[in-house]
Amino acid sequence: METLRFSSNTMQVSFVCQRCNQPLKLDTSFNVLDRMTIHELTAPLVMVTANKQQDSGESSSFPEETFLENKQDGVARKFIPPARMMSAESTNSFTLIGEASDGGTMENLSRRLKVTSNLFDIMSGQTDIDHPLCEECTDTLLDHLDTQLNITENECQNYKSCLELLSQLPEEEEASLLNALQQLKQEEESLIQELESIETKREAVAKELDEGRNHSQLMDTEELRYQKEYCEFKRQQLELDDDLKSVDNQMRYCQIQLDKLKKTNVFNATFHIWHSGQFGTINNFRLGRLPSVPVEWNEINAAWGQTVLLLHALASKMGLCFQRYQLVPYGNHSYLESLSDKSKELPLYCSGGLRFFWDNKFDHAMVAFLDCVQQFKEEVEKDDTGFCLPYRMDVDKGKIEDTGGSGGSYSIKTQFNSEEQWTKALKFMLTNLKWGLAWVSSQFYNR
């Protein structure tokens, strides 16, 4: 609060404003303060009544809450005790020590500084404002206190008006006001009860609302789960629909193929009999031989193997068992077995050469095969009297007659026969087999 400055010959003590911190120059009257003045400064702001002074005069402390009302202005005064009481033995006192021109000057300066500090402590203890203050801050503080004083005086005046108005009210009006007050209290109690009832209902409604929200959240969770399940089932349904469409397409394709297969003649598809120039062919294998077209014997043997297989399949389809011979389809080494002599095999294949001209087993095998074709014809004629092959066969002579054409007969044997006639006889035999194949197909596949 104070600042001390020293020099070799002089010493100066200065104070600063407690608001703006500006240095202050104190009045000389602060240097002369007797004990009576200090006692007046430390006394309470408002003196209490004589009785209370006697009761509390010897006490070192003042009552914390004391109000007195001046009957002239009607203002209640509150005693504010000082924050720090000064005495000769104040603990805040101090002695300034330093160098001076003589001992008396230092003692006087210390005393003045102590008195001034005590005075500022007293002033700060009486109010909430710290001292010292500069002139400008003091003016600002006074303006603020004047404003508060005016507000307080206006409030006191309003209170006095209310008291005068209340004192002028007649007793009857007071009684009516008391009745009205009682009614208002009863109405207040009724409203409080109603408020409590409404609060209870509100709590119940809030509880129901919480339950409804919980139920709504549960329903939202269930809805989300059901939605996921629905999407999963929808995906499975789409996959199953795709699978079903795929299966339907496969069934439709299989049905088309089945219808096509039903219309397909197995024998015609398996055994294709046709001609190539002067040769009769079966599955594109030429059966026969010409001087100008020396067909390989492997091809001729393969053609005989297909022919044996065809007749064997037709007989099996009809349930026909040949007499005297048994067909053994064995590719390009097919042969016939004699039923009277099991050890006797008639080969329907040949390798050519000189042995071919002197070996008559090949010729016997071709005549035996012609016998089997004749038996097939006779079996068909038993079921269909109108059935007739285009070329008549003479098994005893081993010849085939061209009844519808030149009328000549052609031997199926190779010995003592030309290749042209042998090839033509084989061609006529394949033609008869083609007719037999057509009849079996019509009887068993086109019904």
UniProtKB/Swiss-Prot annotation:
Protein name: Beclin-1
Segments for region (Evolutionary conserved domain (ECD)): 242-447
Positions bearing the Glycyl lysine isopeptide (Lys-Gly) (interchain with G-Cter in ubiquitin) cross-link: K399
Places the protein is found: Cytoplasm; Golgi apparatus, trans-Golgi network membrane; Endosome membrane; Endoplasmic reticulum membrane
Description of what induces expression: Expressed during follicle development in the ovary.
Gene inactivation effect: Results in defects in morphogenesis, increased numbers of dead cells, abnormal heart structure, and reduced organismal survival. Reduces the regenerative response to muscle injury with accumulation of sarcomeric and nuclear debris.
Topology relative to the membrane: Peripheral membrane protein
SUBUNIT field: Component of the PI3K (PI3KC3/PI3K-III/class III phosphatidylinositol 3-kinase) complex. Interacts with the poly-Gln domain of ATXN3; the interaction causes deubiquitination at Lys-399 and stabilizes BECN1.
Annotated source species: Danio rerio
Region Interaction with BCL2 and BCL2L1 isoform Bcl-X(L): start-end pairs: 109-156
Note: Expanded poly-Gln tracts inhibit ATXN3-BECN1 interaction, decrease BECN1 levels and impair starvation-induced autophagy.
Gene label: becn1
GO cellular component, one term: autophagosome
